[in-house]
A protein has these predicted regions:
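Bacterial N-terminal signal peptides that target proteins for export
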Residues: 1-9
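N-terminal accessory beta-strand-rich subdomains and adjacent acidic, glycine-rich linkers
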Residues: 25-296
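An acidic-aromatic substrate-binding cleft motif
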Residues: 261-356, 362, 366
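Bacterial N-terminal signal peptides
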Residues: 9-19
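Aromatic- and carboxylate-enriched substrate-binding clefts and catalytic-loop regions
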Residues: 370-557, 561
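Catalytic domains of carbohydrate-active enzymes that cleave complex glycans
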Residues: 555, 565-577
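Glycan-recognition and catalytic regions of carbohydrate-active enzymes
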Residues: 109, 581-606
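Conserved, mostly hydrophobic/aromatic
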Residues: 135, 359, 483, 571
Length: 606
């Protein structure tokens, strides 16, 4: 007993000498990860993480800076600390495996800020392959409505790691990845920022999550977030002298970074770590930190393999627009039946029937048709509010006839809702647009958010837009519609809770192969970065790599091979897989196309 008391006294003495007032620690279920949490002498919450005895995250501060209120950053004492263990196995509606184990040890620390009489909870969950933590704000008198000026979560790295990164940006993830040391990011940033339809880079050392790194001693570390709900998307800003990342939230039109009302929580901040790179790919931390499925009936949610009227527009053979006669249009005032067709419109009855016939013959589920609705003549770059109504087709696209024709062949059409960034307009028309889909036999929609946002000044990854994306998914579920969102915020595992979110783009996809290409290693990095948050609708399957016969593109060669295009169906998982090329190009290579027909979109194990 005397020896135990002596050890305890020594431990307390060490804490006092180091300036640490209070401390707690937990380990992962397999004991390989250890989290240490403390409140230092200034009342600042601090955490650190180790793996197999190696430091992964050096001591890092936690907190939030508030607007017009004292911050939640210091002056805290530890009021309570509770530990618990959780272990379950659940089945996803679709995915790479049939069952997922959700096993973690938890530490929930209640902190009291005496000067303001406010409490917050920081909740940590340690899994065998990493950690998640979040801020929780209980209902209380002195912390009710508050505005975030900045979240000050730190991730202090242990050295100048190799990172695989894209520039931090409030409006796009469609950049090529750069491989460099952390210390080299600043010097490489300018060259890494390439033109996009909407972009707002924010810092010479700002990067996006999911961020994959490798240490000199062989550890693989991934930083991301999970369950992004009613909050701004998190980027990371690097102090490149000390190798400390700090969270950097996406602002709104007036510069604020989040409007919260207690009780509420932040998203989870995630750290996946292993000495085996394969464990990063196999990790289910992002999904496990999301809530279970919100729907009782999921029988209507099905994985989809599809073709579509899309690549021929991307590659310049066809157009989204019906006519070239109009420099600008106002919906409801233009009589398209009196306009001269441009002869290159892709979404025609004849062309769509060709895709339907091909899909039916080869067992594909759906046919995407872009450019079917009025408004494409001046859809981009004009900051138009009322840009589409989502229900009025061009004269050469017979909605009822084509859907009946598809149904007779055992195929469905996939709807396309391009918003051109006019989110306010989309929400005004959303119920009508979804009902139009149901009335005409559609059960899936590809939505797009190309260009700058309306309301003007908002960003693609701000709190307002993140709430919109989720609103669209939940509203779609009311109509039993699945959503494939392009140009939206990168996924954070919400497909577990809302499995009708069946697809996302949110990265540099196949379309860039027609615009000069991506770096050769781009698709090898996507599984370690972008796909950590959820599946990607990469739209692979380009067989004919010569594009010069299709239009006037400056780059007439797709930088790929047939073998690579087939491999992408396995390496870039998605329950929504497109065979993106023209049907006539597949008909030349039916031996290779057999692989696309056979490859699964829903796996029991992989």
């Amino acid at each position: 007993m005397k020896a135990i008391c002596t050890k305890l006294a020594c431990f307390l003495l060490v804490l006092l000498v180091s300036g640490v007032a209070m401390a707690e620690s937990i380990t992962s279920p397999n004991g390989q990860l250890q989290l240490n949490f403390s409140v230092n002498a200034q009342g600042e919450p601090v955490y650190e993480l180790s793996y197999k005895g190696k430091p992964v995250i050096n001591p890092s501060k936690l907190g939030l800076e508030l607007k017009n209120d004292p911050g939640l950053m210091n002056g805290f004492t530890m009021e309570d600390a509770k530990t618990s263990t959780f272990d379950e196995t659940w089945e996803p509606v679709w995915g790479e495996v049939k069952q997922i184990r959700n096993h973690y040890n938890e530490l929930a620390v209640t902190l009291n800020q005496k000067a303001q009489d406010r409490n917050i909870i920081i909740r940590f969950r340690l899994f065998d392959d990493g950690m998640g933590f979040r801020y929780e704000f209980p209902l209380q008198k002195n912390l009710n409505y508050f505005v975030i000026k900045e979240e000050r979560t730190q991730f202090a790295m242990t050295g100048d790691h190799t990172a695989f990164w894209i520039p931090g940006d409030y409006d796009t993830q469609e950049y090529d990845y750069t491989e460099s040391k952390l210390s080299e990011i600043r010097g490489l940033m300018k060259g890494a920022i390439t033109p996009n339809s909407s972009q707002t880079p924010f810092s010479p050392t700002g990067v996006q999550t999911s961020l994959q790194m490798k240490t000199a001693d062989g550890l693989y570390i991934n930083l991301h977030e999970a369950a992004l709900v009613d909050y701004s998307c998190m980027h990371l800003n690097l102090d490149d002298k000390n190798f400390v990342f700090e969270s950097w939230l996406t602002p709104d039109a007036v510069g604020d970074k989040g409007y919260l009302q207690a009780p509420c929580t932040s998203p989870w901040r995630t750290v996946i770590v292993s000495d085996d790179a394969r464990d990063i790919l196999a990790s289910k931390i992002t999904l496990n930190l999301n809530e279970p499925c919100a729907y009782e009936d999921v029988s209507w949610i099905k994985p989809v393999k599809y073709v579509g009227v899309w690549w021929e527009m991307i590659a310049g053979k066809s157009t989204w627009a019906y006519t070239d006669d109009l420099p600008s249009i106002k919906l409801g005032e233009v009589d398209y039946s009196k306009m001269k067709p441009n002869g290159r419109h892709g979404a025609t009855n004849e062309n769509v029937k060709k895709y339907i016939d091909f899909a039916a013959e080869h067992g594909l589920d759906q046919v995407l048709v872009e450019g079917w609705n009025e408004g494409w003549e001046d859809w981009f770059g004009k900051s138009k509010d009322y840009v589409f109504d989502f229900v009025t087709p061009y004269p050469d696209f017979d909605v009822k006839m084509l859907n009946e024709y598809a149904k007779s062949k055992g195929v469905k059409l996939m709807m396309h809702h391009e918003t051109s960034g006019s989110v306010r307009n989309y929400e005004r028309h959303m119920d009508k647009a979804y009902q139009f889909m149901v009335d005409n036999g559609y059960n899936a929609v590809k939505s797009g958010y190309v260009g700058n946002m309306i309301p003007r000044g908002e960003h693609h990854y701000g709190q307002w837009l993140n709430n919109h994306y989720l609103y669209a998914v939940k509203k779609a579920a009311d109509y039993k519609i699945c959503v494939n969102a392009h140009e939206a915020v990168r996924p954070t595992g919400l497909c577990r809770t809302y499995p009708n979110l069946i697809g996302n783009e949110s990265a540099r996809g196949t379309e860039y192969e027609a615009f000069g290409g991506s770096k050769p290693f781009h698709t090898t990095l996507l599984p370690f970065n972008r796909l950590i948050g959820g599946p990607m609708d990469y739209t692979p399957g380009i067989f004919d790599t010569k594009l010069d016969f299709m239009g006037d593109l400056p780059h007439g060669q797709v930088q790929t091979t047939l073998a690579k295009q087939l491999a992408l169906y396995v390496t870039l998982y998605s329950p929504l897989q497109m065979a993106a090329d023209l049907v006539e190009n597949y008909e030349k290579h039916m031996d290779a196309f057999q692989f696309i027909k056979d490859v699964a979109v829903d796996w029991d194990d992989s």
